[in-house]
From Swiss-Prot:
Organism: Methanosarcina acetivorans (strain ATCC 35395 / DSM 2834 / JCM 12185 / C2A)
Name this protein carries in UniProt: Argininosuccinate synthase
Family: Belongs to the argininosuccinate synthase family. Type 1 subfamily.
NCBIfam families attached to this UniProt entry: argG, PRK00509.1, PRK13820.1
HAMAP family referenced in this protein's UniProt entry, alphabetically: Arg_succ_synth_type1
Pathway entry: Amino-acid biosynthesis; L-arginine biosynthesis; L-arginine from L-ornithine and carbamoyl phosphate: step 2/3
EC assignment: 6.3.4.5
Residue positions binding ATP: A8, Y9, S10, G11, G12, L13, D14, T15, S16, G116
SUPFAM superfamilies, alphabetized: Adenine nucleotide alpha hydrolases-like, Argininosuccinate synthetase, C-terminal domain
GO molecular function per UniProt: argininosuccinate synthase activity; ATP binding
Gene3D superfamilies named among the record's database cross-references: Argininosuccinate synthetase, chain A, domain 2, HUPs
Primary location class: cytoplasm
Length: 394
């Protein structure tokens, strides 16, 4: 019987060297590679396909772009998804990729699932949270063999596998429609200033246009549906906003991130559309949700973000949180106007048919509310503090 292993394949160095390793070191007869398109550059997909066709036994490329936006990015927006300032593009993509790999593995009759993640990062956990829901063996060559980037480069050359990274510029890039991450090499030193060459989606503030770009974003039930009045599908909307915001230098993050294992890591990200959509959505929520809803939802959003970052999207709690979030978003419909200028994002205005805001009630010129009615409330505001003071002064 032919022993098959299904490998989550990106076309990069790590997953490419996994192919001969799985045969030579682990004894598998065939390696089935699966690439999942969640918005990577088309050229990257083509390169991965071409490389896999040469070095794997069978290759799948699965288009999951629309599914990724609809089922993973839109829930993230509704939850104001944020982990320590990170918009979690890689985090929410991994479970979807893992599920597609499992589907292909079952179709091919594979007995094992493999990934190219290291033992120091988060992705190993995100993949395996899905992989280990099956009865198939799970293999992680990078982790199990304790491989280094330098060793992989040499090994790839020995096996005729083309590599684009070098020992001098060994940073790793992961990209999907929501974010682009750049890490590794000299970037691991938190005191190292990243060279401008690592950025592709965003212009520097210095090179951004000298005129601001104003954008109107329409939301329906917490989900963005239009830019400047033009209705767009989810993937198309995020892609277009990436271009607009990135051109104006919006959407860069350089941060120290606490990984799941407890390690601190220096990470560089680009996420133009994510920056704009999350800010606009949160602003619209303030217009339509009650104070109590906003206060409680912050707790829910934080818990949701942690589960999403950890890759635990199949946890019952994750579904419970989504149920509350979805209910809260029923009224989050309206338009937010934003200004993008040389790396800065400014909310200019917002409107909603469900706004709890009343200009008439809050206006200094309005007499709709008799200000004297507030006197009774004011007398008892801070009442317990006054009682406490009297007790302490006895």
């Amino acid at each position: 019987m032919v022993k098959k292993v299904a490998l989550a394949y990106s076309g990069g160095l790590d997953t490419s060297v996994c192919i001969p390793i799985l045969k030579e070191k682990y004894g598998y007869d065939e390696v089935i590679t699966i690439s999942v398109d969640v918005g990577q550059p088309e050229e990257e997909i083509k390169k991965a396909d071409a490389k896999a066709e040469k070095i794997s036994n069978k290759h799948y490329t699965i288009d999951a772009k629309e599914e990724f936006v609809k089922d993973y990015i839109f829930p993230l927006i509704k939850a104001n998804g944020d982990y320590e300032g990170y918009v979690m593009g890689t985090s929410v993509a991994r479970p979807l990729i893992a599920k597609k790999v499992v589907e292909a593995a079952i179709k091919e009759g594979a007995v094992a699932l493999a990934h190219g993640c290291t033992g120091k990062g988060n992705d190993q956990l995100r993949f395996e949270a899905v992989f280990r829901q099956t009865d198939m063996d799970v293999i992680a060559p990078m982790r199990e063999m304790n491989l280094t980037r330098e060793w992989e480069i040499d090994y790839a050359k020995e096996h005729g596998i083309p590599v684009e990274v070098t020992k001098a510029k060994p940073w790793s890039v992961d990209e999907n429609i929501w974010s682009r991450s750049i890490e590794g090499g000299k970037l691991e030193d938190p005191s190292f200033v990243p060279p401008e060459e690592i950025f592709e989606w965003t212009k520097s503030a210095e090179d951004a246009p000298n005129e601001p770009r104003i954008v109107d974003i329409d939301f329906e039930a917490g989900v963005p549906v239009a830019l400047d009045g033009e209705k767009l599908g989810g993937y198309a909307l995020v892609r277009k906003l990436n271009e607009i915001a990135g051109e104006n230098g919006v959407g860069r993050t350089d941060m120290i991130e606490d990984r799941v294992l407890g390690l601190k890591a220096r990470e560089n990200y680009e996420h133009p559309a994510a920056t704009v959509l999350l800010a606009a959505h949160a602003d619209l929520e303030k217009l339509v949700l009650t104070r109590g809803e906003l206060k409680f939802k912050k707790i829910v959003d934080e818990q949701w973000s942690e589960l999403a970052y950890y890759g635990l999207v199949d946890e019952p709690l994750y579904a419970d949180l989504n149920a509350f979030i979805d209910k809260s978003q029923e009224r989050v419909t309206g338009t937010v106007k934003v200004k993008l200028y040389k790396g800065a994002l400014t909310i200019l205005a917002r409107s909603s048919p469900n706004a709890l805001y009343s200009e008439d009630l809050v206006s200094f010129d309005s007499q709709t509310i008799d200000q004297k009615d507030a006197e009774g409330f004011a007398k008892y505001h801070g009442f317990q503090a006054r009682m406490y003071r009297k007790v302490m002064e006895k």
